[in-house]
């Protein structure tokens, strides 16, 4: 093939049949007899004809790719037609698939302490980091709409799941995406500094300018069933905060044992 033939535009009419779907762009090719066109796919789609859609949730990601393990994945947001990063956990608790909606270090608490979950405060959705991460409100809400449970963990990035300093509840009992509340709520399990309670009521608070958390001093005074965590709690200045807010901290609580300690909040669904 001479130079003139190489520079001649390729026209084989393969793109006339519009083989690329979901907004994909077709380019004709004359260099390979077996591959006469190429599809450049729109964001969120892939495959020979752009016929496959990227996963939009952790559950879908793990279902589409049976070999997928817990880790950071790129998910497709159909509302904005963009990709974003999130940590999916399908291993730590048998029967559950969890989506991380927030993670922050005690050092960065000042950026999260006044952010209720029903407020929009996205952080590092395109470049995941355990020390400062949160999904946007629309993405958290979409995740909540397909979830059944809520949990909070400490230092998951360095220690994985430990049931000391941990909470789990049904979203029907603690609707963290809407709840403006200070009082007793039902938990499936809650543990603070080694004290724990199963299928009981315990303190939960989230206000317009207070991050969701529990208080080991004031909570037991509200008539909740879980009261043993008051033993050894830091009382001054305002009562020990656990899993967020952190105006008064206890170094025995794993989420606040050092400035590099991290707190995670997750939304989850049972695996079927």
PLM regions: where:
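Mature extracellular or lumenal effector domains of secreted proteins
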Residues: 1-272
